[in-house]
Curated annotation (Swiss-Prot):
Belongs to the MurCDEF family. ATP binds at G97, T98, N99, G100, K101, T102, T103. GO terms for cellular component: cytoplasm. This is UDP-N-acetylmuramoylalanine--D-glutamate ligase. Cell wall formation. Catalyzes the addition of glutamate to the nucleotide precursor UDP-N-acetylmuramoyl-L-alanine (UMA). NCBIfam families: murD (TIGR01087). The keyword ATP-binding applies. It is found in: Cytoplasm. Its main location: cytoplasm. Keywords: ATP-binding, Cell cycle, Cell division, Cell shape, Cell wall biogenesis/degradation, Cytoplasm, Ligase, Nucleotide-binding, Peptidoglycan synthesis.
Amino acid sequence: MKISLFGYGKTTCSIAENLVDKFGPFDIYDDHFTETKKDTLGNLLLNPNDFDDNLSNIEIPSPGFPPNHKLIQEAKNLQSEYDFFYDVMPKSVWISGTNGKTTTTQMAMHLLSHIGAVMGGNVGTPLAELDPYAKLWILETSSFTLHYTHKAKPEIYALLPISPDHLSWHGSFKDYIQDKLSVLKRMNECDVAILPKIHTNTPTKAHIISYEDEKDLATKFSIDTEKISFKSPFLLDAIMALAIEKILLDTLSYKLLNNFVMEKNKLEEIKDSQNRLWVNDTKATNESAVMAALNRYKDKKIHLIIGGDDKGVDLSNLFDFMKGFDIELYAIGISTEKMLNYAKKANLKAYKCEILQRAVSEISNHLKVNEVALLSPACASLDQFSSYAQRGEVFKECIKKL
C-alpha cells in the first residue's frame, strides 16, 4: 500500500516517523521540496508536481493543508489523520469551537487522566503518538481536521460557540460552520453532542444537549458555578470539561478542576517594573476571543495592541463593540492600515505602530497603574512571527526591558 502525505508538518511527519516500519516508506509532498530526496527513515520527499494519483492508495493531508491546493484536487483517496487512525481509536471525546478548545481539552484531561485518558489532536500530540490501548482519547479538533474527516466520529462531541475565523481557508463563515458541524451526521444514538442552541436542529442521530450560555450549560448538568474558581472567559471551558466528566463518570470534581493551571499566552498577566499591568493574550486570533478579553477588563482603561494577519475576516463588529470601552488602540502587523481605518470609522483613538516593539514602547508612554495594556490582536501572527507563542514571548521580553 502506497500512502502519500501532503505537507511536511507535525502530523504528517509523526505518521511517517512512527509508522514507517509498518507501512514502508511514505511519499511526502510539500511545496518547499524542489527536488526529490529521502529523509533519514527512507521516506521520499517530493514536489507536488511529482504526484501521480494512480500510484497512491491513500492521501493524508496536514490539518491546515489548503483545500484549494492542486494535490487536494487530484487526490482520489483523501482521508484525514482521524480517519486513518479510526480503526484503532478507542472511545473518544472531540472538543471543538472557535475559542476555548485548548483550555477545555486540557481541563478535561486534568479531570480524566486518572481513568487512563490521553490527550492529543490540535493541542499538540499527533494521533500517531497516542496510545491506541488508552481508555479514552480526548482530542482538540480543529475545523481543518473536520473538513478532511469523512469516516471517524467521537462518542462525545463538545462544541463551544462558533464565531468567524479562518475564513480565507474555508471560503466563508457558512462553510466554516458546516465543517464544525459535519461530524454530527456520522454520530449515532449512543453518542452525545453538546451544542450551542443555535445549532440544535443540525441533523444527527446523536443525543443533543444544547445550551445558550455558561449558566444554561451549568444548569443542564447540575453544575454549581460558585464552586468553580475560574471566571469568564474560562468559565465556559471549565463547565464544558465538567459536563464531559459528568457524562462519562457521573461525577463533578470541582476541587480537582480548581487545581488546573492555565497555559501561557491566554490572558497571562504580567507586572512591569512600575507595577503596571500588561496582559499577554497573543492566542486571541479572532474577534470573539478579543471581546472576551475586553469584557474581563471592562472596568479599566484599556490600551489594546491589535493587528497581524487578519485571515480575510471583517472585524467591523469588533470595532463597533469597542465603542463601549475606555480604550486606545495600537495597530501592528501587515494589517496596520486596515486596523487604523476600522478605528477611524468607529471614532476610536489609534496609533500606527506597525511592529510589536514600537507598540509596547508607545503604550509605556501613556499607561497608568490603574489601567491595563492588552495584547489581544484578533489576528494570526505569521506575518511577523513564527507562531502566536513567539509573538507572546517577544511581548514579554519588551516588557522586561521597560
